[in-house]
Amino acid sequence: MLAKRIIPCLDVRDGQVVKGVQFRNHEIIGDIVPLAKRYAEEGADELVFYDITASSDGRVVDKSWVSRVAEVIDIPFCVAGGIKSLEDAAKILSFGADKISINSPALADPTLITRLADRFGVQCIVVGIDTWYDAETGKYHVNQYTGDESRTRVTQWETLDWVQEVQKRGAGEIVLNMMNQDGVRNGYDLKQLKKVREVCHVPLIASGGAGTMEHFLEAFRDADVDGALAASVFHKQIINIGELKAYLATQGVEIRIC
């Protein structure tokens, strides 16, 4: 059995790490490189960096920090934000990133997933899915351009359909960003995760809602996700990664102990 992964998420805007609630009202958390180093030392299995402004305002991620991160950590990391071409991806991977993640550009041009997978291998192609639960219809819908409140829009894709589509096109991993839960720290959306798990046959990462150690346990035990991504609880030092992993191990979760 593969070990479950604990993955801190660092949202990057203008060279600094920020965090919002339900993708809005972002506050500055700190500088990128020291935070990355701290999380690696605490025992994170992987890091994910999202340039949350890149896709919405047309820029590719400012790459100067990618190589600096690669120099100070020895765990895999993934970079997302405005990657619209093979050239964009090649540059980021050449700076030392292990994976690249695409989200809004994949919705704009789904063939990008296949072209990236063919060029670089499925193992380093992650597709992020920003999913919103519509209480009126009882359905989960994929959102696009969530880095900019004024441009965020609901797409025609229902989440379960898009999950299956990106797998067919070559996604090697899926990060499910559950927008309703983002930053509110009351638990992952287990109902949605279970539905997605049934149709997702590549590694599935839960994102949005972690507030306690028990929330991580529930995601692993009840929804069988491969990794759990979180931001607020790590940034605000509500949960220590080493202590979280020790707790999960006592609960029978297969986890890498540092």
UniProtKB/Swiss-Prot annotation:
Catalytic activity: 5-[(5-phospho-1-deoxy-D-ribulos-1-ylimino)methylamino]-1-(5-phospho-beta-D-ribosyl)imidazole-4-carboxamide + L-glutamine = D-erythro-1-(imidazol-4-yl)glycerol 3-phosphate + 5-amino-1-(5-phospho-beta-D-ribosyl)imidazole-4-carboxamide + L-glutamate + H(+)
Gene3D superfamilies xrefs: Aldolase class I (3.20.20.70)
Signal peptide residues on this chain, from the entry's feature table: none
SUPFAM superfamilies in alphabetical order: Ribulose-phoshate binding barrel
Presence of keyword Transport: no
InterPro entries per record: Aldolase_TIM (IPR013785), His_biosynth (IPR006062), HisF (IPR004651), IGPS_HisA/HisF (IPR050064), RibuloseP-bd_barrel (IPR011060)
Top-tier EC class: lyase
Listed GO biological process terms: L-histidine biosynthetic process
Active-site residue list: D11, D130
Enzyme Commission number(s): 4.3.2.10
GO molecular function, one term: imidazoleglycerol-phosphate synthase activity
HAMAP family linked to this entry: HisF
Protein name in UniProt: Imidazole glycerol phosphate synthase subunit HisF
